[in-house]
Every structure is written in structure tokens, then in C-alpha cells.
Amino acid sequence: MKKIYADSEKGKTNPLVKTVWESKIKQTPSKNKHISYSSISTYNKCPKLWELQYLRKAVPFRQNIYTCFGTAMHETMQTWLETMYHDKVKTANEMDKHQLLYDNMIKAYRSGKAQNGHEHFTTSDELNMFWLEGKHILDFLEKKRAAYFSTKNMKLAGIETLLYQEIKPGIMFKGLVDLIFYHPNTGRWSVVDIKTSTSGWRDNQKKNPNLTA
């Protein structure tokens, strides 16, 4: 497995950082029944849809351009950040992130098409439009990198970290945390959930500490 930090930094790093990072390898979901945030969200919006989709399996989830783009952007950002924190900032800056996003979108599209019974769910023009928007997002993140993802006072502790907790006997909650950072100067942790959207955030959402803290 790739080293988390240089040997010279081992003494400075909270051992929990290593524990969190390796949890995605060590945790293996059991065969117990589990629920996810997606299923809870679906139930809150429409119990009938939840019944048809999760209980009766009568309405299978279908991939679309938004899930395709979201998956590709997640993977691109996570690869970029892992390179930045676990290798070098210079190496991350030299990555062709535009090409990486394109490759990830094609991979996500092919996977989604297979899940949809090999039916096309978008067009080449739409894929290209989303890719162009994604390039702007990546350029913005690189420009603001030091403000959002400082390598001086933050350590990347987790990517796609598995949450698998019993909430009732025999019922588990299963979820994945996009990014977990450790702040050695304060001993605090921060969790980042990557979201892609065409609508952006309203002012009240930006000020909601439960969404931005």
C-alpha cells in the first residue's frame, strides 16, 4: 500500500490518521441488512418510491449524465488530492486533470450504460458540454487550492472511508465519506462531501454550519 506520509513525518502524525486511512481496506461489510443515506433520502421524499425501488425492486435506479459526471468528478478530485498530499504538490500541479476527467467520464459512461441494459443515456454533445464545465471547476479548484486544501496545516486522512455502524440489532447503516482531513495544529478533523450541481447553493445553504462546517 502507498505510504501515507514521509518517514520523517511519522512522529508528528496522529496515529488516528493512519487508522482512518486504512479503514477502507480493513472494514468489510457483513451480510447483515443495511440502509444507506440514499434510501433514507428517498423514503423521506416519497415512501411509495422507496417501496418500489428498495423493497420490491420494481423501479431500478437508472444512470444518467448527472451521476456519470458526479462519479467522474469525484474520482478526478480524489486522485488529484491523493497525489498532492501523499506525493508532492508539484506532481499534482503537473497532472493533466482535464484529460483525467475526460477518461473518468468515459469510464463512468460505459459502466452506467452497462447498468442500464446497454442503453445510451446521453449524447456525445452533452458529454462534451459537461466535460467543458468540469474543466472550469478543476481550474477554479487549482487556482484556489491553497485556500481550500492547504498542505501546511492539513493532512489527508481518508478517501471514500467506509461508515458501517449498527443502528439497531441486525440493521447497519452503510455510507462512504468522500474526504477526511486531519488538522495537526488543532487536533481537529474535517469532513468534505463532494457535490456537483447545476443550480449551485443558495445563500442560506452557504451559511448553514451543518452543510459547510
Question: What do the predicted segments below correspond to?
Answer:
Residues 1-67:
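C-terminal, charged and often intrinsically disordered regions of DNA end-processing helicases
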Residues 2-13, 25, 96-99, 110, ...:
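Metal-dependent nuclease catalytic regions and adjoining charged, substrate-binding loops involved
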Residues 35, 68-72, 129, 174, ...:
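Generic recognition of stable, solvent-exposed alpha-helical segments in well-folded globular domains
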Residues 40-86, 131, 135-139, 160-161:
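Nuclease catalytic cores
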Residues 47-60, 116-117, 191, 197-201:
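Short amphipathic alpha-helical segments and their helix-coil junctions
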Residues 61-65, 69, 122, 126, ...:
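Conserved aromatic-histidine-acidic binding/catalytic patches
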Residues 76-159:
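A non-catalytic, helix-rich entry segment at domain boundaries
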Residues 154-213:
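Mg2+/Mn2+-dependent nuclease catalytic core
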